[in-house]
Amino acid sequence: MAAFDKCKTRPAHIDAILNGLDRYNPETTAVFQDYVVQQCEDRTFDCYANLALLKLYQFNPPLLNAETVTNILAKALTVFPSPAFSLSLALLPAYTQPYATSSTQATTANLPMQTADFVEAVQKLTHLSTLLESAQYTAFWSTLNSDDLYADLTADVAGFEELIRIRIAVEVGKAFREIGADVLMGWLDMRGMETLEKFVVDVCGWEVDKSKAEGENGVIVRVPRNKENEARGEVKGEKVGIEMFGRVVRRGFEQPA
């Protein structure tokens, strides 16, 4: 597993900022914001750099750029399950939090319209994160497709839906050896057996079994065995030295104080 603060695709000038005092220089905000745009375009993700930018926003609230923040959150969705989204959310102003206290709710009620829109955007993305992290994949897609605002919030992230489907497939591959194609179709928000088959075969390397199928019913998707989905018994043992056992017996004969 790669170190949290490392990213293979990170440009040298970003790495230099993160490892120097300029990391806390407000003048680097524009550089980090451009880097977020780059991540959205080339499908990379640098959590450490994004958190550094959010920390700059936290220290310098007037510099906060709402579009950049929502892009960071949208990108964090594409690497679930990971702490990236919750870590990003924790650095945002208290009034954006989805589980606000009575004091922050009172503050939110008096926010200007532009800021209120930002709060709504953050909370909608948080709802999507909750659905993904709790494996409610069908509900995630229905929610994503239920409001044009979701499309606007993820529009800057190239291949957003494809990246989410790949992450869902990775999680399915950890938990299943076989799964009904109709169920998987709902989890991946795909229409038609041909589209699903192309994805699971070409992208995932899985097999589609139609031997017992009647039309699209009864089609099974088979996932190759891996260390995560292989059912195996686990026997654990612990060696206890005789001197340890002797102390336990001796303590039983000791007189209480």
UniProtKB/Swiss-Prot annotation:
Keyword Cytoplasm: yes
Cell compartments where the protein resides: Cytoplasm
InterPro entries, per database record: ARM-type_fold (IPR016024), CSN8_PSD8_EIF3K (IPR033464), eIF3k (IPR009374), PCI_dom (IPR000717), Transl_init_fac_sub12_N_euk (IPR016020), WH-like_DNA-bd_sf (IPR036388), WH_DNA-bd_sf (IPR036390)
GO molecular function, one term: translation initiation factor activity
GO terms classed as biological process: formation of cytoplasmic translation initiation complex; regulation of translational initiation
Keywords: Cytoplasm, Initiation factor, Protein biosynthesis
Domain PCI stretches: 45-227
GO cellular component: eukaryotic 43S preinitiation complex; eukaryotic 48S preinitiation complex; eukaryotic translation initiation factor 3 complex
Main location (coarse class): cytoplasm
PANTHER family, per database record: EUKARYOTIC TRANSLATION INITIATION FACTOR 3 SUBUNIT 11, EUKARYOTIC TRANSLATION INITIATION FACTOR 3 SUBUNIT K
Functional summary from the UniProt entry: Component of the eukaryotic translation initiation factor 3 (eIF-3) complex, which is involved in protein synthesis of a specialized repertoire of mRNAs and, together with other initiation factors, stimulates binding of mRNA and methionyl-tRNAi to the 40S ribosome. The eIF-3 complex specifically targets and initiates translation of a subset of mRNAs involved in cell proliferation.
Family statement: Belongs to the eIF-3 subunit K family.
Oligomeric and partner information: Component of the eukaryotic translation initiation factor 3 (eIF-3) complex.
Protein name: Eukaryotic translation initiation factor 3 subunit K
Species, as recorded: Coccidioides immitis (strain RS)
